[in-house]
Amino acid sequence: MAETYYKPCSEFDRCNELIEKYWNTKQFEKCFEGHMELAEKGYPLAECQVGYFFYDGIGVEKDADKAFYWTQRAAEHGDRDGQFNLAYFYEEGIGTPVNMEKAKHWYKKAAEQNHDLAIQKCQDLNLGMNTAQG
């Protein structure tokens, strides 16, 4: 799983350093472009970030459909933040119709990876997840 998640570290690390530089200097468009480059190569962490950029309009125009698309990719590729965010999108109807069954599914998936907010959400929704199952 870690290999799929991070892929070749040297490429990821190089891109991540550049992305961090752009973020710290508030060059958000370049930061978005760097994340998109990694997301298109299948890095779940970058996919999640691209979804967030589209959701919040950071370095790119807000687009709920694209936010949903990239967040869903991240979730399906095992990113726990992506899973939590996708659950939230289903719960709130962001880029997709409201679907509480799918929201619950993704909250559980994120909670199984010890995502604190997902664990709390599962408790709030009485999903029978009193503790993380990592």
Give the residues covered by each predicted segment.
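Long, contiguous interaction/recruitment modules in multidomain scaffold/adaptor proteins
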Residues: M1-S10
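Short helix-capping/linker turns of helical repeat alpha-solenoids
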Residues: S10-E11, E40-P44, D56-I58, D63, ...
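Alpha-helical segment of the N-proximal tetratricopeptide repeat
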Residues: S10-K41, D56
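Hydrophobic face of amphipathic alpha-helices that form TPR/SEL1-like repeat modules
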Residues: N16-K21, Q49-D56, N85-E92, K121-M129
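Leucine-rich solenoid repeat scaffolds
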Residues: K104-N126
